[in-house]
């Protein structure tokens, strides 16, 4: 948005310099993009064409003699509308063109030198919706030859955020500056004489909106004064006539879009409604648009379309210099309706840009009166009563506000009196009878103020962000779970797994195939049909990752993820974190030594044991039980228990599930439920190496097949816990030679004495304790063949 310094001072009574205003605008949150002191615009002057002669070697070019008030220059021009006696804009040699930043130089055009360029609207960046024809600018005779065309008044360009539609008018910016202490906001003049004449044109609204209108009869439309043309020119808008220019001026000054119709083209009534599909509309810019039900149109009783409401007017009822009777419209429409309407016809105008960002619904009458007053002053005429129709109801927004919240949230030292003064200057109505709790009514032009925290922000930006006191950030304690996560990630990375992060959603079909219930986990509005369920397990998404990487040619995949699951066993809450891993393919890439092999259940068993040890749970304190999970292999899987608490599982994926995911080779996986891990205190003791020789003995026991090998290890170790240091399995055998329901388990037992070297008898006694314990508790016997 652009405006000049003098334009701002029309509404802001101040004597501060431009530099002070620029700094304050940035301080209060209005970004200043550029300040143009207009030195380069002085080279664009009013020139008169004295002669027009044909070019000797180019039919479309003409050799012109033009006067810039100081000298007569030769200019070669290709415009079809150039003629003797016309006044236009001359870009002198050295001028920088506003649109492409090109520099005007002395050039030869087909052998003839040209000392400047006569300019068109497009070349100067001037928008003229009503004149889309090519040609140089033709100025009225009231312009003086030699005067500068552009106003040499400093131009301020600002960026207005979408929430501050009120600052899309110069008056809104002046209001903020006045509230910040840079002067006093001037009062807006009012229409002094009101009419008692009934309007011959009525309005009817059939959409979400408010429309007010006024009929003015017998005007003498005229050319706009230079000050008005200059203001519009700064914003890139070409002057049309005084009546049209005034509507643009009110819009740019007060963020109040207006539209003016030739009243004689309207049949009795304007009806604002949705357009029919495939309706043709001829706009002011001489273009045809095909309308749809997204567009709001103003039609009369003959169903003639006079405007696409909030966007652009119709060529049918455009206001021209010879127009005598006009109808002024001031309206409010729902921002979303104008967004859709503008997108439908792919046209954005100054008017639609403002409607989309909210305009003040309570300023309709005032904007109408301001335009009426200026039209009567410059063009004469008789005005009639305002007609209106309202479908939208404007409600006041009232908020409870604690003034102390400014001090506590903003960490500033500000008094209640200062807070009150800021709010009043911004247009808020404040009931401060209660010292601690105020009742604040939000002004109608501030649609962005919805909560008391927004009021705090308003006070702070005017008081000054630089006055917020610095305060050190409090040191917060690190969540122990975060520390665990980092440690586990480092551990698994060292084990050769790569971390992945997947969606918190998964595919309901696959979840049900794995046996998870979807009753409580369905998403009402999923981002995809394949992501319609909150994940009950990380395994589901990791298998999808395996499938996708397999499709890209990966033959070895080892991945893990730490994250939350939902609804698992119906006990998961906000801390339902788990760690899940998947291995696929070979344990190592192909190599010279051929030491690679396919991953198996023991790889993921090792992963689980490493994780539990990292969490202070030793391997000798866990118990492996047969898993009943349908998606795991029935004999190559196990659940992991600690003190009768299931901490997770590991195993090979069931072939049916592998086939379901279209994976080509067996997959092994694990999942550890971190939210179930108990806090285990570890007594750190000094590691002392025994100075006495340890003794190893091997035992091969015959036990029933349904007896847990882990149970055998525990019985062996507990038979003499002081002397036995370690028990490991080194062989398993089953076959007809030992019986159908029997299993041979070979154990290696390490005896580690602490105070003397064991003799043969002590070793025999310790061995007998093991054999007797296994026989008594498990019915196992020492294998003798």
UniProtKB/Swiss-Prot annotation:
Protein's recorded name: Phenylalanine--tRNA ligase beta subunit
Q: Which InterPro entries match?
A: aa-tRNA-synth_II/BPL/LPL, B3/B4_tRNA-bd, DNA-bd_dom_put_sf, Fdx_antiC-bd, Fdx_antiC-bd_sf, NA-bd_OB-fold, Phe-tRNA-ligase_IIc_bsu, Phe-tRNA-ligase_IIc_bsu_bact
Recorded hits in PANTHER family, A to Z, give: PHENYLALANINE--TRNA LIGASE BETA SUBUNIT, PHENYLALANYL-TRNA SYNTHETASE BETA CHAIN AND LEUCINE-RICH REPEAT-CONTAINING PROTEIN 47
Alphabetized UniProt keyword annotations = Aminoacyl-tRNA synthetase, ATP-binding, Cytoplasm, Ligase, Magnesium, Metal-binding, Nucleotide-binding, Protein biosynthesis, RNA-binding, tRNA-binding
Identify the residues that bind Mg(2+): 448, 454, 457-458
Catalyzed reaction equations: tRNA(Phe) + L-phenylalanine + ATP = L-phenylalanyl-tRNA(Phe) + AMP + diphosphate + H(+)
Origin species: Ehrlichia canis (strain Jake)
User: Oligomeric state and partners?
Assistant: Tetramer of two alpha and two beta subunits.
